[in-house]
């Protein structure tokens, strides 16, 4: 939904409105979407959080660029806010797919406290949204786990030179190529071909 104060992030909710109209787009819940839900719930007077937790949620969101997103949200009319709210609340934490006989688990940050025997539905949202896996982290042997949240520049401690590239460690694939960094760019993984695409 947002990151920092850059002009390109001032229209995060406009982008979500566009995405909500596209049946071919599946948006997974990320930590910024979760922060927006918590903060906007509190700011709108919803009783989803206690007062102390609500104030903490707003501070956390604002520390992560939420002020710019709040201004964008406030520009929406009531119908657009309903669409956004429904879209945010419907975002899944993960998506399992099979493409060309390859199994994939797509999620935002990874799986904290991972065990291959642990059912996915037993992971708390925070274990998926805020996970920062180590570079040598592996997950399942029978499927690819594709995630972002941790820019590859941080995952590799900046040891890679040149423009950022999608990071692979066995079946664990980090596609966050750190657009916010000078060496960053948008990294996409084509599940049909397993080829990297960069913008």
Predicted regions span which residues?
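Active-site micro-motifs of SAM-dependent methyltransferase domains
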Residues: 2-3, 34-35, 113, 152-153
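Acidic, His/Gly-enriched loop-helix segments that form or flank divalent-metal centers
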Residues: 53, 60-174, 178-184
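DEDD superfamily 3′-5′ metal-dependent exonuclease/proofreading module
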Residues: 156-157, 188-190, 198
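Short acidic-glycine loop/turn motifs at beta-strand connectors
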Residues: 98-101, 190-195
């Amino acid at each position: 939904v947002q990151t920092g104060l850059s002009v390109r992030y001032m229209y995060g909710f406009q982008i979500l409105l566009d995405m909500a109209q596209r049946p071919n787009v599946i948006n997974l819940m990320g930590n910024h979407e979760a922060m927006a839900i918590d903060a906007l719930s509190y700011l709108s007077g919803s009783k989803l959080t206690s007062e102390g937790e609500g104030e903490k949620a707003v501070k956390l969101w604002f520390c992560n660029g939420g002020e710019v997103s709040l201004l964008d949200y406030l520009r929406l009319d009531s119908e657009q806010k309903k669409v956004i709210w429904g879209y945010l609340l419907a975002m899944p934490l993960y998506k399992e797919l099979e493409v060309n006989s390859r199994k994939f688990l797509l999620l935002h940050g990874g799986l904290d406290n991972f065990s291959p025997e642990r059912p996915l539905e037993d992971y708390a949202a925070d274990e998926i949204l805020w996970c920062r896996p180590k570079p040598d982290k592996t997950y399942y042997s029978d499927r690819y786990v594709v995630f972002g949240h941790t820019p590859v520049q941080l995952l590799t401690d900046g040891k890679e030179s040149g423009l950022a590239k999608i990071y692979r460690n066995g079946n664990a694939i980090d596609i966050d190529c750190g657009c916010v960094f000078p060496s960053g760019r948008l990294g996409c993984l084509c599940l049909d071909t397993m080829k990297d695409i960069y913008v």
